[in-house]
Amino acid sequence: MSEKLIVKCPTCRTEVIWDESSPYRPFCCKRCQLIDLGEWAAEEKRIPSQSESNDSDEWSEMPEQDPKPFN
């Protein structure tokens, strides 16, 4: 039998066995999973990019030049 892979929960650092017995892996529990999700949703975490600009800087709300009525 092979050795079981053990990882640390990204939220609380508790050791977690990486197999079917740990349904929230890599998290130790649903609570830690939701804490992490909340941090991503609040934009406390992000994936680093090479560019420093924010994607929203490139977005603009431009009104239509020639709106056409619906007929």
Swiss-Prot record:
The keyword Membrane does not apply. Residues 43-71 are annotated as: Disordered. Its cofactor is Zn(2+). Keywords: Metal-binding, Zinc. One of its GO terms (biological process) is regulation of DNA-templated transcription. It comes from the Bacteria. Binds 1 zinc ion. Disulfide bonds: none annotated. Residues 54-64 have a biased composition (Acidic residues). Zn(2+) binds at C9, C12, C28, C32. GO terms for molecular function: DNA topoisomerase type II (double strand cut, ATP-hydrolyzing) inhibitor activity; zinc ion binding. It holds the Pfam family YacG. The keyword Zinc applies. Interacts with GyrB. Belongs to the DNA gyrase inhibitor YacG family. Inhibits all the catalytic activities of DNA gyrase by preventing its interaction with DNA. Acts by binding directly to the C-terminal domain of GyrB, which probably disrupts DNA binding by the gyrase. This is DNA gyrase inhibitor YacG. It comes from Proteus mirabilis (strain HI4320). The gene is yacG.
